[in-house]
Amino acid sequence: MRRIILGIVFVIGLIAPASAQRAEIEAVNAKWTEFFNKGDFAGVASLYTGDATVLPPGMAMVKGAAAIEAMWKNTAEQVGDPKLMTLDVKSLGPSAAREIGTFSLKTKGATPQEVTGKYVVVWEKVGGDWKLAADIWNDGK
C-alpha cells in the first residue's frame, strides 16, 4: 500500500509542475497577443529572452530584442488579430519548456484572409518569468 501511495504522489508531482507551466505560458501568450494588438512591439519583444532567436518562414533568423521588435512591427503592417492556441507544453525541467500550438491571423487589405499555421516555442524561465527563447512557425494545418 505504501508503494502505491508513493507512486501516486510521484505521478502527481510530475503532472502538477507541467500544468502550472502550461498555465503560466498561456498567460504570457495572452500578454503577447495583447501587446501585438495594441501595437506595443517593445512589449512583445520584452517577452523574449535577451538572446532569443525567431525563425520566421522564408526569412533570415532574427536575434535580439531590437531586431525582434522591428520584425513584429513590420509583420503587423501586413497581418493582425493573432490568436494562439496551445496544444501541448512539455516540461524540460524547472526552468525550460517546449510548447506546440496553432495560430490564426488575418491579412490586412481590401479582402482580408485568414491564415492558419502551427508553431513551436522553447521557453526559458528568467528571473521568475517565462520568456520565449526560440520561436518558429509556418503556415498550414
Residue ranges and their predicted role:
Residues T116-K141:
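Short beta-strand edge/turn micro-motifs at domain boundaries
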Residues I4, I8-G50:
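Short, low-complexity N-terminal intrinsically disordered segments enriched in polar/charged residues
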Residues F41, D51, M59-M61, L105-K106, ...:
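Solvent-exposed loop/turn segments at secondary-structure junctions
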